Regions:
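Catalytic toxin/effector domains delivered as secreted proteins or via bacterial secretion systems
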Residues: 2-132
Length: 132
């Protein structure tokens, strides 16, 4: 795995800042090398393989982020579980278009009610430790 700051346009990375620590449904779970104990951060903005996806878990093993990459290896969208402008965490999606990361599209609300059933059903197999 690489890093977002050392991506080569020809593909791949100049240094490794991420390591694979497992898989869920054939999608690699990554952990940033050297990250402080309780820190999570976000997945790299570029993937090593066109069209791949990665998963990031919290230090306690609970789901934090799923990131899908396009054929150009750039981040296409994220599924996140967190407190984006909310007192409580909820499941939401960010779609990348250009350089901006738009406001989230809720998949659940802060109470845990499923709002977007089709997205939830599609990605629920990756939501390790999330109780709705």
């Amino acid at each position: 795995m690489g890093s977002s700051g050392s991506y080569l346009k020809s593909g791949g990375f100049t240094s490794q800042e991420w390591e694979q620590v497992g898989e869920i449904k054939s999608v690699k779970i990554l952990r940033k090398i050297g990250l402080k104990k309780d820190a999570t951060g976000n997945l790299p903005l570029y993937g090593n393989t066109p069209g791949t996806a990665y998963i990031l878990l919290k230090p306690n093993g609970r789901f934090h982020q799923f990131r899908q990459y396009g054929e150009d290896r750039k981040a296409k969208f994220d599924i996140d579980y967190g407190r984006h402008n909310s007192a409580k965490p909820y499941l939401h999606m960010h779609t990348y278009s250009g350089k901006d990361r738009p406001e989230p599209m809720p998949i659940t609300n802060a109470k845990g009610d499923i709002i977007n059933k089709s997205l939830y059903e599609k990605y629920k197999g990756f939501l390790k430790g999330i109780k709705l």
